[in-house]
Amino acid sequence: VGETRKASKEDLQKESLVRFKNAVRHGTTTIEIKSGYGLEKETEIKQLKVANWLGTLGLADTVVTYMGAHAIPDDMDRYTYVASVLKNLEELRELAEFCDVFCEEGVFTEEESRTILEAARNAGFGLKIHADEFGDTGGGKLAAELRVISADHLAGSTLETIQALRDSGVIGVLLPGTPLAILSDHFAPARKMIANNLPIAIATDCNPNCYTESMQLIQQLAVFRMGMTPAESLVASTINAALAIGKTDRGCIAEGWKADLLICDIPDYRHLTYHFGINHVETVIIDGKVIDA
């Protein structure tokens, strides 16, 4: 947070562009970018503007999410900070499509998260939530109650919560890179979710705590550590991932769908996870155009 506050907009553009290009080279064609490392209005705006700028470069599509409610900053008490997040929602709506809150023990309470998300909905944001990363602490149930578009993490969600998410039409976004990075064996129960018909997506969670831009690595972790099949990991990183950011025109190779395609040097799709540790992508095509990242 401190480094992000000190960085100029140009610094953030330069550093973010490197990561953005890495993601594209590894096969990501639509990228959700979240703020949350400013924890005060000016730096959150700076991050959101850089995220929007990346989407203008013609390298990949972007979806921008405001996540001012990522943590309580050290220089402010929680009541004052929640009030500041609420105050800024209307102004920040023009810079972001979605609003996300980290509802977890030690971060934002269920009631604080509900207050922020309901206000965000009234301001015109789509809703997302980080929930149940370490245990079933109410975030997943809140996601179901508010019918958010997606809920991230869910490693600690119980069967009751999984079924509530399913019944509310929420997409579960699983982030297997995160437990890997923090040396944890606490991966999301993907098999239980699939058995109970909860649609799941997977994502990198690329951040200082989980530093990877490679969706191929995430697919591999989904198979090796969460028990998903190669086909399930492919669905979770394409059409389901698109649905988790509100996109219904991509993620499938079919007539009338957006022509976002990857040409990979593999015998069939199963080698994306079977042959791990390398980049299989040879050519990235976005909206029918070959991309040089």
Where are these regions (language model features)?
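Metal-coordinating catalytic core of metallo-dependent amide/deamination hydrolases
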Residues: G2-L17, K21, T29-T137, P208
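Non-catalytic positions within long, well-ordered alpha-helices that form the structural scaffold/packing
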Residues: V24, L92-R93, R121, A144, ...
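Short, Lys/Arg- and Gly-enriched loop/turn segments at beta-strand edges
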Residues: Y269-Y274
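Active-site-adjacent C-terminal substructures of enzyme catalytic domains
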Residues: G126, D136-C252, D265, F276, ...
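Short aromatic-centered micro-motifs
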Residues: V284
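Loop/turn positions that initiate beta-strands
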Residues: G256-A259
